[in-house]
Amino acid sequence: LTLKLNGAVVKTATGTEMAYTHQLDKQGNYDFELTATNGTETATATASTCVPYNPTKANRPAGIVNGIYYDKSDNTKVTLCTFAGSKTEPAKHVFVVGDFNDWTISNDYQLKQANDSAYFWIELTGLTPQKEYAMQYVVVRADGVVKRISDLYSELVLHSDDSWEPSQNFPNLKPYPAAGEGYVTVIQTDKPEFEWSDATLNFKRPNKNNLVIYELWVRDHTPARTFEALMERMEYFEDLGVNAIELMPICEFDGNDSWGYNPNHYFAVDKSYGTSEQLKDFIDECHKRGIAVIIDMVFNHTTGQNPMAVLYPYGNDLKYNPWYNNSGSIPHKDREFEPDWNHDFGPTKTMFTRCFQYWLNEYKVDGFRLDLSHGLCGTTDDDVEHLQEYYANGVQAVSSDAYMILEHWDSGASTLVNAGMMCWENTSEAYQETAMGWYDDKSGSKSDLSRANKDDYVSYCESHDEERSFFKAKQWGDGAMTTDEAVRVGRVPLNMAFLTLLNGPQMFYHFAELGFDDSKFQNEDSKWGKNDYGITSELGADYDAKTQVKKRIEHWLLEGTVQMAAFQKVGQIIQLRTRIMPEVFEGNPTAATLTDGKALRTIQWGSDVFVAGNFAASGNQTVNIPSGTWYNYLQETQQSGSTLTLAPGEVVVLTGKQVALPKMPAGYKFKTDIEDIVVIEPTEMLPPYNVQVYTLSGQVIMRQTNVMNADLTGLNTGLYIVQYEKNGQTIAKKVIR
């Protein structure tokens, strides 16, 4: 046995064991190498550590602030800069470890300290262009505690949870490094640039007050739950007529299955949905069809996996963390169980401003919806509106016509609207009532449809938070709609017309166009949990099921279904606004009857468009038609007579000039990807496999040994992970039962 330290032999021995003690009393690197030989074979093991030098003090290179900077003139070089400090003092030392130095803590990779500040930086050279390197910072805090963190500005991160994701979701994903701890950053110089089409480069965003927004959760819209699968539905979105798609949060979040309101890295796309290139493909295809893309951002809070939260974690250490508000001191109670960003801190504001600008520049998104915007604050909430204006100015600096939509319920909403932003307007209760055939609303109440008839406020019949209107119609609707699907779904175009043909920006949650009738508070076994009001169904499930898997809708879109008939009519109604007469709807309606408690409601856009609907569950209604020449848009006929009789649940749309009714598909045949059997490919190298089936929470619910096929027939419907070994590697596949 031979032991070397920094290349010099320090001890030799004969046998199978050696003991050696060395006092690490001098600053520097210590590289140990132990060699064992029996005369014919030799084995070597190495270990390295260091006693840190005091960090070199040096100004950051010009233009380097915080994050990852690639040198366009040198594709073998990257500059890293990170903030590492408490409210009162910087860290003692910061090192970078990664694939480029075998994850070794070394003085050679200690970051320089910028001007006695809490910013530390380093230039890495000699990297292979386009090669991916995993890396982390090792921070020695001022109190001596050592933390490993990713880069706050990471565009791709890895986590040990990635092994649970099907490989097809993110092809060729770099394996998680054995030496990693928590989230690790991936850097890559000379990354190929995405080629945007002219449709994106020259995209003209729809007028903000003429938006018809389709809120979409990537996980639930297709069985495959990916950006790539959404690409297969572009005709569907185009036929529906919406001119904006709002994606629920897609930034990296904890775990692999979430709404996304638990973010940890704001510059990285969550890998469960696919690659950044696939997201760009989706955005580009939307632009080719005149559809803007809005993304939902969560700047109120983060999880404890954010690198700045890891550095001084939630709990006792949080009081030292300049990035977050202290628990118990924040003026609002929203999300107080997660680290709450301190927006008084300059680097916090800089990060989020850069985040907005990054998504506009890198992904060509068209705007943002800001979750829980009324909760954004510093140590007080006195300046919330000014803070929103600060961020809006950052957006406008990059793109003057980008959308800024706020989930802002406070009285300050009018101030923000006057500053050019849009605010959410929750009108879902009104549309639940009209869907059920209960129309005795009172002006000014939540069931008042006129609240959805104004510029600058995004009104909606459903959002991800609200109950499904046609679930309520199925449960508590008037007359036959609780038992007759055709009657119930036949009311969908009526409800949608009196949303999408009103004034101002409008929104609905995906599948509202089909009259989706599963409760938001119902899981995949059709059991209900508590709703937002704490009401639990008679089935007694004691949990919130809003994020649980819901039933699939692909069979509804086949030719001849009542849902497909509703979709066809809804698409024609929306296209009237977004494609055929957008200039009309960019103005203001001249008259509307929305709040008088009568079954008959009307909307009039001068001599251009007249809409009438009968919201009753029984009994016809007669409407007086405004004077002039009118054409029945949905029937492609000229209107004769001065009155129209409407059946229960019927809507009529008249136009002042004859326009072509858009041709709609008879149906769609989308992939279902639902399999009861997972076939495991046989190989000549291995015998039959041992298979384990897990729930998404990690619970083992099935074990099968020596099998070539895993039979899932006996399991409840839902999403599972099937794990087995192949060629010495553990393989995990996500399967929908």
PLM-predicted stretches and their roles:
Residues 10-16, 110-115, 702-706:
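Short beta-strand segments within Ig-like beta-sandwich modules, predominantly Fibronectin type-III
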Residues 660-737:
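C-terminal outer-membrane/trafficking sorting elements
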Residues 641-662:
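C-terminal beta-strand-rich structural cap/linker in extracellular carbohydrate-active enzymes
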